[in-house]
């Protein structure tokens, strides 16, 4: 005989918890989502929620006053759950939602007065009958679909990656928008392509097989990445951390070499089997074979796509009908951008304090809709390298630039257009996901579409033209029939959630009509039920005045609470003789008595029955409405794609007009010619006019520009400016310049700045050399290379030798010959112009006025003659005594050697063997003995302009220390 009796609800909770052992389980209890046991302790700490307790069992072995057992409990109101779940997901947790399967069934089982449901309240557990619950979805970082939990203007991708014998299968999807795509990489660049794609997508979650042979060290799951951290713990301590704490610590344990910042999840190997994934995809997409969608002959892409689809189905607990079409793509039509280049060019995020505000997308994103913003973001992160689609896009932007009124009108029509893409995808999943709010947003968007179409009617053929060969043009269908259906079905201002309507109360005179989901007249059954039941509500509404008049008790009032339902309240000061005999006492208060009557209970029952039926009927009608929209989903998605493109194109046109951008001429050769180009981001932040600069590169005469000049003169800005103008041209945008001719590039490589990678034990110089090696190995003649101060992380001569060798390799190697900008402080490299025919010298100009340096920010032909390092040190706030001493040393050193001309740079000095002075302390060098001495000769040969600012400061500090000793 069991001595511990678990309550029925707790047995149900334990069973559901076993289904979602690796997730926090939110268990619906009436108006709250509750958590219990370890989950409760966790969220109480994480979310600052009060930790309480709830009786879950009786232990009859204990004394009677100690038999009740309590479980820790913490919960949140159902209407605020999105905020709490968002925070948990952001911390890396998985959240399982256990809902009551049938609200009306729960109502029927509830022992409270049935009148509580007339006010729209949800049920609680009864002691006799248990409400059935089930996990309706598991929310993970990559499967979020609720708009309240997602950023409006960015995608939330779930990705799946499988690697086998150097070949890669990749699939990704956004469950909130319905985007679903797959690719397979099989050549020698497969891993490089995967890394670039993961950098582009920035998935919130990446699925990998639970077999180490089929995944990369760069994509280790959480458990593997934390194994080292957990190893020192005892078994009990490790178990105490699982399953939640290991997830919370995922970022601490994540490998710095990981190719994604998203959550990495293991998915069982059998889910990746080719036979399984093929069957799942064909069944879901209703295809006779995978050849129809382009997956035939791509087994790894098939396995990745099928595994992802199964994961989505399992977490959503249903068919993910929003994933209706799979796009198989090839990276050959797009520019691959590695993570370093994306970071260096600050496409989506700046490394500075301004973050996204100082990025390229902050300049270009003038879209009016969330759909357009997401599309423009994809364009920026995936530039085209084929001229035909670029010309189509560029021509559309040009039309909108020229047609001012059309551009202004369409942007006005698009303003405040709801995110119909995400709303439609929730509707596609039916009543388990869709809400009246989604229907309302779709209706509001459809109402605005005729104005959008009218504004650009004459331009639609250009705006919606097919970009890729073989693709049909986009179609703009205002879907008037769908709008008509929604107008007839939905009330003017429906509540956000089902079950919140009040159908039984008529509009008060001069007041607003109560909110309801379904419009009167749409469904005859609903209207008939409302008419038949409304007199019960009207009776209760009139009861107070009726009873006052009948009894003569002026203080009598009719009230309601959740415990007792409707009641008649009479002050205890009233003479008991005035109280009718048929009044049944229900509750005694300090100053009043509460009563019910048979008549009141009868009408209260009618009202409760009506509420039950109305909730069921409303859900049925809403599901029917979702079903009626299913045949129109493809039309609506096509219209959404058209709206997104029009919005993105209009945004680029608006930026072009406001920024005085020009239409670049696109070419297929290696010309890169820009006249008075400007940095699009820096220009926007300056209060004074930006100083433009020219560049003229090609593969025949001027392939490599060596750019010298002082720090702060604008070299790095110019390098990024050229790369950004090129990238902008290859998304179809106009560019910030007076004129531009852009020979399309297949890749942009940047080596700008570096820092120690402490987590992987790599120094600044190692990081720099690794990145340089990658670009030298991966570049092609059509690439654009941007190099800034290669070799600065090591000794002067080592760095100079490496820098020169890199330039020679790019110039001479038959596989390369690509356009290159090479900024350097090694002035000796300007001699390469005489030795290599396709090298040209340029410098960022600066002049000295009244002892102060003025940076002109102008790119001029020829090499620089000075670095102005001491002036930069002064601007940085170096103490005046250090600046004075450095100036004296520089003057002395410059006086000991003949001046050099930029046109005739001296060869690097030969190494000097410096003998040691044998002292009791070992070898000691004298830096300040001005008598002829090998150390002095060494100093005379030292060239200050060759030093980076950091190296110069280190030398100065050492000199100052030695001077103080002497």
UniProtKB/Swiss-Prot annotation:
Location of the region described as Disordered in the Swiss-Prot/TrEMBL record: 894-914
Record's keyword terms, sorted: ATP-binding, DNA damage, DNA repair, DNA-binding, Nucleotide-binding
Segments traversing the membrane: none
UniProt: ATP binding residues: 709-716
InterPro entries xref list: DNA_mismatch_repair_MutS, DNA_mismatch_repair_MutS-lik_N, DNA_mismatch_repair_MutS/MSH, DNA_mismatch_repair_MutS_C, DNA_mismatch_repair_MutS_clamp, DNA_mismatch_repair_MutS_core, DNA_mismatch_repair_MutS_N, DNA_mismatch_repair_MutS_sf
GO function term, MF aspect, one: mismatched DNA binding
A GO-annotated cellular component: cytosol
Skewed-composition ranges (Pro residues): 899-912
Domain of life: Bacteria
Pfam families per the UniProt record, alphabetical: MutS_I, MutS_II, MutS_III, MutS_IV, MutS_V
GO biological process: mismatch repair
Functional note: This protein is involved in the repair of mismatches in DNA. It is possible that it carries out the mismatch recognition step. This protein has a weak ATPase activity.
NCBIfam families (alphabetical): mutS1 (TIGR01070), PRK05399.1 (NF003810)
Protein family membership: Belongs to the DNA mismatch repair MutS family.
Name recorded for this polypeptide: DNA mismatch repair protein MutS
Native source species: Chloroflexus aurantiacus (strain ATCC 29366 / DSM 635 / J-10-fl)
């Amino acid at each position: 005989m069991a001595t511990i009796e678990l309550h029925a609800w707790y047995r149900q909770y334990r069973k559901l918890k076993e289904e979602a052992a690796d997730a926090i389980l939110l268990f619906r209890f009436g108006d709250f989502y509750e958590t219990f046991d370890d989950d409760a302790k966790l969220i109480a700490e994480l979310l600052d929620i009060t930790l309480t307790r709830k009786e879950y069992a009786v232990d009859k072995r204990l004394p009677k006053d100690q038999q009740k057992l309590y479980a820790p409990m913490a919960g949140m109101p159902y209407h605020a759950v999105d905020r709490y779940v968002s925070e948990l997901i952001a911390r890396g947790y998985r959240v399982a939602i256990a809902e009551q399967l049938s609200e009306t069934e729960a109502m029927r089982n509830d022992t409270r007065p049935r009148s509580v449901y007339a006010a729209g309240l949800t049920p609680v557990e009864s002691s006799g009958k248990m409400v059935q619950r089930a996990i309706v979805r598991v929310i993970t970082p990559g499967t979020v679909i609720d708009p309240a939990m997602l950023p409006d203007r960015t995608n939330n991708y779930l990705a799946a990656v499988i690697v086998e014998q150097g070949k890669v299968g990749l699939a990704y999807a956004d469950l909130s928008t319905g985007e679903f795509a797959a690719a397979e990489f099989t050549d020698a660049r497969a891993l490089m392509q995967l890394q670039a794609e993961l950098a582009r997508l920035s998935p919130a979650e990446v699925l990998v097989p639970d077999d180490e042979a089929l995944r990369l060290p760069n994509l280790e799951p959480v458990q593997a990445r934390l194994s080292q951290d957990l190893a020192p713990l005892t078994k009990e301590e490790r178990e105490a951390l699982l399953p939640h704490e290991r997830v919370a610590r995922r970022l601490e344990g994540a490998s710095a070499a990981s190719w994604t910042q998203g959550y990495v999840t293991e998915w069982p190997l059998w889910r990746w089997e080719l036979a399984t994934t093929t069957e799942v995809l064909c069944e879901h997409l209703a295809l006779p074979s995978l050849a129809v969608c382009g997956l035939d002959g791509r087994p790894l892409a098939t396995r990745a796509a099928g595994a992802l689809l199964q994961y989505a189905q399992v977490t959503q607990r249903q068919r993910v009908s929003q994933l209706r079409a799979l796009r198989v793509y090839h990276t050959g039509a797009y520019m691959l951008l590695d993570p370093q280049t994306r970071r260096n060019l600050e496409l989506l995020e700046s490394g500075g304090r301004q973050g996204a505000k100082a990025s390229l997308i902050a300049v270009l994103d003038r879209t009016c809709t969330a759909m357009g913003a997401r599309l423009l973001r994809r364009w920026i992160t995936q530039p085209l390298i084929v001229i035909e689609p670029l010309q189509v896009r560029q021509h559309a932007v040009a039309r909108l630039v020229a047609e001012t009124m059309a551009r202004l009108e369409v942007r006005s029509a698009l303003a405040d257009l709801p995110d119909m893409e995400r709303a439609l995808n929730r509707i596609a999943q039916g009543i388990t996901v869709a809400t009246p709010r989604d229907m309302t947003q779709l209706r509001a968007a459809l109402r605005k579409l005729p104005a959008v179409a009218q504004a650009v009617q004459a331009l639609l053929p250009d705006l919606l033209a097919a970009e890729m060969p073989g693709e049909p043009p986009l179609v703009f269908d205002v879907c008037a029939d769908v709008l008509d259906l929604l107008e007839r079905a939905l009330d003017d201002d429906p509540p956000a959630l089902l079950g919140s309507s009040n159908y039984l109360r008529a509009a008060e005179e001069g007041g607003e009509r109560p909110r309801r989901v379904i419009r009167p007249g749409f469904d005859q059954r609903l209207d008939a039920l409302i008419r038949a039941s409304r007199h019960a509500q009207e009776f209760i509404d009139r009861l107070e005045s009726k009873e006052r008049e009948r009894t003569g008790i002026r203080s009598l009032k009719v009230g309601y609470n959740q415990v007792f339902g409707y009641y008649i309240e009479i002050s205890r000061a009233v003479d008991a003789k005035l109280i009718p005999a048929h009044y049944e006492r229900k509750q005694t208060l300090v100053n009043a008595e509460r009563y019910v009557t048979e008549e009141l209970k009868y009408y209260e029952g009618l009202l409760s029955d009506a509420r039950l039926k109305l909730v069921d009927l409303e859900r049925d009608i809403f599901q029917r409405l979702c079903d009626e929209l299913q045949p129109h989903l493809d039309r609506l998605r096509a219209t959404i794609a058209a709206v997104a493109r029009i919005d993105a194109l209009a945004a680029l046109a608006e930026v072009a007009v406001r920024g005085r951008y020009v239409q670049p001429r696109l070419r297929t050769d290696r010309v890169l010619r820009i006249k008075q180009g400007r940095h699009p981001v820096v220009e926007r932040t300056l209060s004074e006019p930006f100083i433009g600069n020219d560049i003229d590169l090609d593969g025949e005469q001027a392939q490599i520009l060596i750019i010298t000049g002082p720090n702060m003169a604008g070299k790095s800005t110019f390098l990024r400016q050229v790369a950004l103008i090129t990238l902008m041209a290859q998304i179809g945008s106009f560019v910030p310049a007076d004129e531009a001719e852009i020979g399309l590039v297949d890749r942009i490589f940047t080596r700008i700045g570096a820092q120690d990678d402490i987590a992987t034990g790599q120094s600044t110089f190692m990081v720099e050399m690794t990145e340089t090696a990658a670009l030298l190995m991966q570049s092609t003649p059509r690439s654009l290379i941007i190099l800034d101060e290669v070799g600065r992380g090591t000794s002067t001569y080592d760095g100079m030798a490496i820098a020169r060798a890199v330039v020679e390799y790019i110039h001479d190697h038959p596989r390369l010959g690509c356009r290159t900008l090479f900024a350097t402080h090694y002035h000796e490299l300007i001699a390469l112009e005489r030795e290599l025919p396709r090298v040209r010298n340029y410098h960022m100009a600066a002049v000295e006025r009244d002892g102060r340096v003025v940076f002109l920010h102008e790119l001029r032909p020829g090499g620089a003659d000075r670095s102005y390092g001491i002036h930069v040190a002064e601007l940085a706030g170096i103490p005046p005594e250090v600046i004075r001493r450095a100036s004296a040393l520089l003057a002395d050193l410059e006086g000991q050697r003949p001046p050099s001309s930029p046109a005739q740079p001296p060869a690097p000095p030969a190494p000097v063997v410096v003998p040691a002075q044998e002292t009791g302390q070992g070898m000691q060098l004298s830096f300040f003995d001005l008598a002829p001495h090998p150390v002095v000769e060494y100093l005379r040969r030292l060239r200050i302009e060759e030093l980076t600012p950091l190296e110069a400061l280190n030398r100065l500090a050492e000199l100052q220390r030695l001077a103080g000793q002497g």
